Amino acid sequence: MSDEIVTNKSVTYVNNTTPVTITSSELDLRSCYQDDEVVIEVHAAALNPIDFITHQLCNSYIFGKYPKTYSRDYSGVIIKAGKDVDNRWKVGDKVNGMYSHIYGERGTLTHYLILNPAKDIPITHMVEVPKDENDPYDDFVYAAAWPLTFGTAFSTLYDFKKDWTSDSKVLVIGASTSVSYAFVHIAKNYFNIGTVVGICSKNSIERNKKLGYDYLVPYDEGSIVENVKKLKQIVLENDKFDMIFDSVGNHDFFPVIDQFLKPKAKNSFYVTIAGNNKANYKNISWRDFVSLSSILKAINPFKKYNWRFGHPYPPNNFIEVGNEMIKKGTYKPPIDSVYEFDQYKEAIDRLMSNRAKGKVVVKMK
């Protein structure tokens, strides 16, 4: 067999009745890409909850019976480039990014990823992560760990509200998630937001203090609403929040939202990336995401506050902001655990456990 003909292994599923598995296909590196595409030999890919959500919601009658590949975040090396590819992307370049798809035959939990760098954005050249001598992870692991979560956090802060100042105040529900980790670093180090309050378990408070939160409130010691209310009255001089950001799925504040969120006229926002309830990744249904209450919050013209569903928005250039923050040392992608490719099931189980503190990454090389 020619060295240009390789076996491409990918982690795939067909629908919500089939488990994830490794599938193999033959790939001819001489002809598998178009003139405007590159072939990336993937070194690492990160898992995200969207992988489980799309898998469990995949009805074969609606979404077809072809193999669908896991994951969106990636890092790797360009090994082939079409003749029409912009010359900023060359063979040998180390790159990372987010390959956006819902039910794509191409995903990033694969050994070879083919994409169009002009269309399949964001993609960027990897930057070196500042590390100490005891750091166990290489740059490929770090590079795969941040595009989707960082992009979600940055887009939430950048796209909805434009007038952040040192007087601004934000409440983060779910301070321990990877998205919230990025959120607080971006809020404090890029937008210079004055006050960021986080809600987390009492056991996570010490960890999260080091991330930059100004104040932390436990959700497992009394009422969340009452605990935040006391903080607002005693410490924040009863000033309300410019944004409430929910990264876990919560509805506790809705009945009393006017006590915590500034008026709609002041350009305040309630932004969620998880819906109104904490998801059980092992048993997900469409009702968890397309509930009547969510629809009403999104389209109801009579509600007194702005409600939005957050997601990464590549055109806002978040990938370059992330690179700059990584180089400056103001953001370091958090890693929970790293697994080899054939340990993909253990990696999935780890993320589904809801116990991961940082990204779960799978290495291909």
Curated annotation (Swiss-Prot):
It is found in: Lipid droplet; Mitochondrion. One of its GO terms (cellular component) is lipid droplet. SUPFAM superfamilies: GroES-like (SSF50129), NAD(P)-binding Rossmann-fold domains (SSF51735). CDD domains: AST1_like. InterPro entries: ADH-like_N, GroES-like_sf, NAD(P)-bd_dom_sf, YIM1/Zinc_Alcohol_DH_Fams. It holds the Pfam family ADH_N. The keyword DNA repair does not apply. Keywords: Lipid droplet, Mitochondrion. Belongs to the YIM1 family. This is Protein YIM1. It comes from Saccharomyces cerevisiae (strain RM11-1a) (Baker's yeast).
